[in-house]
Amino acid sequence: MVNIAINGFGRIGRNVLRALYESGRNNEFNVVAINDIAKPEGIAHLLKYDTAHGRFRFDVALENNTLNVAGDDIALLAISDIKELPWRDLGVDIVLECTGKFDDRASGQAHLDAGAGKVLFSSPGSPDLDNTVIFGTNEDTLTSEQKLVSNGSCTTNCIVPVIQALDAAFGVESGTITTIHASMHDQQVIDAYHEDLRRTRAASQSIIPVDTRLAAGIERILPKFAGKFEAIAVRVPTINVTAMDLSVTLQSKVTIEQVNQALRSAKAGRLQGILDYTEEPLVSVDFNHDPHSCIVDGTQTRVSHKQLVKTLVWCDNEWGFANRMLDTAKVMFDAK
């Protein structure tokens, strides 16, 4: 049993806890504490009721500063200084750092100094962390000495397995990516000030270009592609699920069917449960609550001049990523 604490109980933190129970992994993980400055009543309410993912089907009760989920007691903390967190007293094996605010080595070291065994960040994190893991691609590189680990981003988890599969089958020279991402908490409900002038605009009324570090994230996991990928991103007026438009130049000449067959085959083996494939006429809402990191839409595959290939890949940017947090945390705990 892995003792975990969740630091930051926002979109990812709550989905991690939901995924833990909904997938039956509460026999693998024991959540000993949640740390968030939100009021306990708000924490319990937003765990029970979620606009994107519906009602949580497990019993939730609140008594003083203890959250009870399906009979399991979880301590609720509201401590803003990492150094003051009682991880040592609680016997925390791994902190799931889900604030999005603390993403560097110094923050991770503060968790370790407070008594945590290891830290898994729910963001790309700074380059000086011990490892960045995209589950299904490089989790076998984890060692017991690596205590500060990033789980990458939802978009890196979505696109890297597809690039990996295409490269294994045909060889990939280079590529470009457009991320079509659901709205996020850092956007405005109505026009309001933000340091990014595009994000001053109402999220529900526009398609909004935003900065992305996706290309750098790909290079961190697949260094052979350094300087060979570029990416842009837009946010669209939906609350969940992301589509990724991937275009790659291949080393081999291919047909649409050959590309789709390679991606169909990739859903087995190491990428089973990570990559999925569909040819149904689906739309974004159909992928809500899908636990895969990526779902290839074979109906949208295109080939130009036999070597330029375009694919469309879907993901639930919350639920898929939350499930990968649990996968990576387990491998971190088991690493020898």
Curated annotation (Swiss-Prot):
It is an enzyme of class 1 (oxidoreductase). GO terms for molecular function: erythrose-4-phosphate dehydrogenase activity; NAD binding. CDD domains: GAPDH_C_E4PDH (cd23937), GAPDH_N_E4PDH (cd17892). It holds the Pfam family Gp_dh_C. One of its GO terms (cellular component) is cytoplasm. InterPro entries: E4P_DH_bac, GlycerAld/Erythrose_P_DH, GlycerAld_3-P_DH_cat, GlycerAld_3-P_DH_NAD(P)-bd, NAD(P)-bd_dom_sf. Pathway: Cofactor biosynthesis; pyridoxine 5'-phosphate biosynthesis; pyridoxine 5'-phosphate from D-erythrose 4-phosphate: step 1/5. NAD(+) binds at R11, I12, N317. Its EC number is 1.2.1.72. The keyword Nucleotide-binding does not apply. Substrate binds at S153, C154, T155, R199, T212, R213, R235. Belongs to the glyceraldehyde-3-phosphate dehydrogenase family. Epd subfamily. PANTHER family: GLYCERALDEHYDE-3-PHOSPHATE DEHYDROGENASE 2. This is D-erythrose-4-phosphate dehydrogenase. It comes from Alteromonas mediterranea (strain DSM 17117 / CIP 110805 / LMG 28347 / Deep ecotype). The lineage of its organism: Bacteria, Pseudomonadati, Pseudomonadota, Gammaproteobacteria, Alteromonadales. The gene is epd.
